[in-house]
Amino acid sequence: MAHDVVLIPGDGIGPEITQAMRRVVEATGVQINWNVQEAGAGVMDEFGTPLPQHVLDAVAETKVAIKGPITTPVGTGFRSVNVALRKHFDLYACVRPCLSQPGDGSRFRDVDLVIVRENTEDLYAGIEFDEGAAEVEELSHLVERSGQKTFAADSAISIKPISIAKSRRIVEYAFEYARRCGRKKVTAVHKANIMKATDGLFLRVAREVAANYPDIEFNDKIVDATCMGLVQNPDDFDVLVLPNLYGDIVSDLCAGLVGGLGMAPGSNIGADCAIFEATHGSAPDIAGQDIANPTAEILSAAMMLDHLGENDAANRIRAAVSATLDEGKQVTGDVRRAQTGSVEGAVGTQAFADAVIEHLA
């Protein structure tokens, strides 16, 4: 059976790594009807938005998409396309496996953990007010009337909503994922010692949900202690479930344990839609040079194939990537540098994909 999938190449190195990914997926023999849709900075002039409505319509029809990285301006300009997609389709669970690969150059070995990040609320909800906005003054008066110490008049404000329903939904997802994938422990990560209302709610809900899963070990950990623990003893962790902001930060930390963002796949899962993507940025400084590492995008495609029920093909891709990295003869410059301290002998993006295809069993 053929599967309908939207492919969003993205900005920067996105077209190169998605081309490599597509070739690997097609080499498995799985039939994919690719619906290629452009989004990002490159379509702003034509459509006046980085995320045109027809792209949303295409994803809504297929309910499965895979994308390359899309540039997000820092501080000014349009808001993140990634965040917009997550909010539009209520892709509430960001799942990022972090698994050591042979030859990844990391000082850590045998890391095998999964980040489950709440994707739709917290400080990333996008409820912000610029310095000088009337809403900032209104909020200042509200805080003052509540008897709490107010903030400086020249502040910009971001609101941090944490709800019972969305906390329960993400923690239940983490436990169901652990049970489905044979994982043994779930750790809820928080800062409830300081943010007693918001993170306190998240922790309380996590404990309530954990009581319904007696077969899965549960603990909770403060986010700063979690960061220290991850770099000291990553073996102590299995599945971590976190609110949005902490999940974003900690997932990048965990990517660093396994060779960097070039090795880190990701998925964004909702009730009836899923979007898969490499977790790194668009790297415009190396775009068009055929030197980007497509490993994360290829492994994200393996996650997509699992989602589509093509588990055999997904496992073949993962094994082929591991074999290519382990052999070490045809790897991109970032991997070569990590392995040997030099980029000498490195191959390009498409040549790496060729090597993965050769290793497909």
PLM regions with names:
Residues 1-5:
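Extreme N-terminal starter segment of soluble prokaryotic enzymes
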Residues 11-14, 63, 116, 174, ...:
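Buried hydrophobic positions in well-ordered alpha/beta secondary-structure cores of metabolic enzymes
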